[in-house]
């Protein structure tokens, strides 16, 4: 049901000259040529900022509000989850990006901003009220609107009773996102990263494709086979920058001599070709310094010519024949921070984008929209990775909702994968399709653990990608994986977590009438990060 959002009780405005604070003014006039207006409709409150020459950094709205003492709170994350998502008690110091939910035995209260705002927004809740912070900076400096009226955000509130917390959360996500885009069919298949880790070749990738096609034989929908990092020009060059992972992206290297031919051969084998790209990173091409961000040296999409170059690379890989494009590092390369480092500011001080008239959120949206408009004529599916989901909803079909899993350390898969799947599953089929990352099958992790991970992903109806060393699985394990891939190929299941209120790594899930119990913490394999390197061996008689 709708919850009427009253006008805020208190307003704060931070500019480069100082901080203004006081009671909310219905006329919106706060001096210094700053106009902060609200427009209320039946189901939302729109917030608009108009400013002259004053460089505005933050807008802060404060409401008086009380929450029952037994309430539990859940917020979102800036980009991917890092294993930290959970329902918690009231914590006034907890920044909750984009939205938050307050659950008690009687109802679920939800407050948030609609997707695609023009500010980086987060909430705080405390014993006396709730506060919405809207970061309207341009990078780490104030935005210079020069008379432009900025639609900063649209705030909505809902209350859900007579349903589970998960059902209410999913309904609220649907309310926040009026215009999502979804894949035109089930997306599942293979990705070569978590066993190859960038060491592959044209022929090796085709052998991976053949293996995947064999595992998915008889599936109604063909799988995608995604070529991850390692194909680009500098990936096989000893003179490349030491951190790697960057462009240029106009061609493959000597191990991938013909990228268009490779895409065609993957398709001829019965799989749909996909590819990974890091579109903002190219340390070696002689671009104008204006094209580059001062703190990361990556391309600045607020510069029109830099943006044209960025999307030209997207067009190139689509023209080669790749029908799924996974574009990565698009938050780190812009802001120089991982999501867990944004505590709570997305951008550090001391820099700004080329176009000072745009907020950071507007720059991010411009990038996502340009990539979408470039890929759309090719009917290519887009996966955003290290992307800001609340800004990308409607611009990419799939979002990587958690940090990387591992083909070597089970603890990383358990922490990043299971947690992100459980706590962002409410965004699946509401914002986009939620991708909790791959299943890394290298032999370093017991099959029983990876089997469970693959099983729960398939049963949720979210995209399942497997990354397989072809020499690892025996015939029985291959049959088990083939059965799981068949479930993933249809995406008719919609399992969801049951014990997520009390467990950051939910073990109990409901799939229709079936209650599933997964054993993520098993004595077969240490459930912790090893503090030193040692070899895990089976003890005699164990």
Residues of each region from the PLM?
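Active-site-proximal substrate-binding groove within the catalytic cores of carbohydrate-active enzymes
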Residues: 135-137, 146-153, 191, 357-542
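Aromatic- and carboxylate-enriched substrate-binding clefts and catalytic-loop regions
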Residues: 88, 99, 221-443, 449, ...
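Generic detection of long, well-ordered alpha-helical segments
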Residues: 162, 198-206, 253-256, 361, ...
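Residues that flank catalytic or metal-binding motifs in active/ligand-binding sites
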Residues: 186, 245, 455
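Hydrophobic, Leu/Ile/Phe/Ala-enriched alpha-helical segments that form helix-helix packing faces
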Residues: 49-53, 99-107, 209-216, 263-267, ...
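Carbohydrate-recognition beta-sandwich/jelly-roll modules
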Residues: 1-224, 324
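Short, well-ordered loop/turn elements at secondary-structure boundaries
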Residues: 43, 184, 221, 268-270, ...
